[in-house]
UniProtKB/Swiss-Prot annotation:
Residues at which Zn(2+) 2 binds: 68-69, 212, 270
Natural source organism: Escherichia coli O17:K52:H18 (strain UMN026 / ExPEC)
InterPro entries from the UniProt entry: Metallo-B-lactamas, RibonucZ/Hydroxyglut_hydro, Rnase_BN, RNase_Z/BN
Function: Zinc phosphodiesterase, which has both exoribonuclease and endoribonuclease activities.
Cited NCBIfam families: PRK00055.1-1 (NF000800), PRK00055.1-3 (NF000801), RNase_Z (TIGR02651), true_RNase_BN (TIGR02649)
Protein name as catalogued: Ribonuclease BN
Pfam families to which the protein is assigned, alphabetical: Lactamase_B_2
Enzyme class: hydrolase
Source superkingdom: Bacteria
Keywords from the named record: Endonuclease, Exonuclease, Hydrolase, Metal-binding, Nuclease, tRNA processing, Zinc
Gene3D superfamilies for the chain: Ribonuclease Z/Hydroxyacylglutathione hydrolase-like
Catalytic center residues: 68 (proton acceptor)
PANTHER family: ZINC PHOSPHODIESTERASE ELAC PROTEIN 1
Quaternary structure annotation from Swiss-Prot or TrEMBL: Homodimer.
Amino acid sequence: MELIFLGTSAGVPTRTRNVTAILLNLQHPTQSGLWLFDCGEGTQHQLLHTTFNPGKLDKIFISHLHGDHLFGLPGLLCSRSMSGIIQPLTIYGPQGIREFVETALRISGSWIDYPLEIVEIGAGEILDDGLRKVTAYPLEHPLECYGYRIEEHDKPGALNAQALKAAGVPPGPLFQALKAGKTIMLEDGRQINGADYLAAPVPGKALAIFGDTGPCDAALDLAKGVDVMVHEATLDITMEAKANSRGHSSTRQAATLAREAGVGKLIITHVSSRYDDKGCQHLLRECRSIFPATELANDFTVFNV
């Protein structure tokens, strides 16, 4: 999987940062696709600065209904239709997301020429497509808000082709059945169990993408053991009380959570517009003093998961 940050500013855009939007490139050999997490104003314009085709976008996950995470959605939906894209799209979000989309389309006289499904979610598993699952966790914010945990299913281990050939199993369709863990019968009557020739399963990757939040009970479960955690660091340590009073987190709180959850990497985003480039580097240093494996997301930064 690959993360592409389309917007990394909190609340309002700056000259160098648009408001929140994160693209997830699934990069799976049998199921390509793009998922979008939040869609602040201007997201479709940010997409134009990438090589990604909006037609590949098949799922959008909205964390909450504050404008800096949502106001780009109607425009993106309409432009997708005007471009002749007919591939289905599913939107997941909290209660009210359906009314928002339908009202925006109705009042503006807009229409959508592709299948559009809107799923209003609660806490718990919201999706399992056979390759990965997505679970929503409630966060601490003035509006109903969720973070999303994306977990790939484990992949089958490598097939020991050399041992199978030595056992007299010819390559081809039988190898495919054994790779799936099935038992086959050879012409001489011998049974070969695929599980006996498979290496241990390869653990799937796990990713946690937080919406806006102050410290909360669900955060540790959401982030526990993931390879990459994306979390806001709206304000620095000296402004922690102000951040919490508005349902946000400081650098210290983001980094401390990453350390306690045992994540592989922390990526901080959603930084206040009060910080220029020098100020953003200060935020990064504060996080790294607690959790060294921290990176700062800028607009169009790409990270592998």
